[in-house]
Amino acid sequence: MPKTGTGRTAVARLGDIVQLGPHRLICGDATDPIVLRRLMEGDPPARLVLTDEPYNVKISGHVTGGAHREFAMASGEMSDEEFLAFNVAWIEAALPHLCDGGVLGTFIDWRGAPTVAAAAAKLGLTPLNLIVWAKTNAGMGSLYRSQHELLPLFKKGDAPHVNNIELGKRGRWRS
């Protein structure tokens, strides 16, 4: 097994698929349509694609003091144009596996959110919302540390998305 930047042995290998109940997770390049076809093989299109993409922010010296290795790509080396192309590539690769009315979301920071939104718009997705994940502690690294991550959500196609929450269905409560 290959070593990570921390000297620890990597557990997942490129191409590994892990079964998580009825869900699957693949270790691979999300911009590669073949990887996603292999992951989704035999399944109907998904109602949700949820990712935690690299933010195109250098890890070493910015996010941490050296405990973690850099991402394989989009780890601060991409220009704005390259990061937009990266986002277009992974979203475009995911779209054939997302049903009409399906929701796509990716965790990102404030620097990358406009780029994700531009890529989604370029591919015809409809913005649904911007969710803020408020964490209990701020991240490490810079003077202005974020205590949140952003989760922009987009919808594919014209069909309604599935609403399992049903807010307001049984009355409205205001706080």
Residue ranges of model-derived segments:
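Core catalytic lobe of class I
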Residues: 1-175
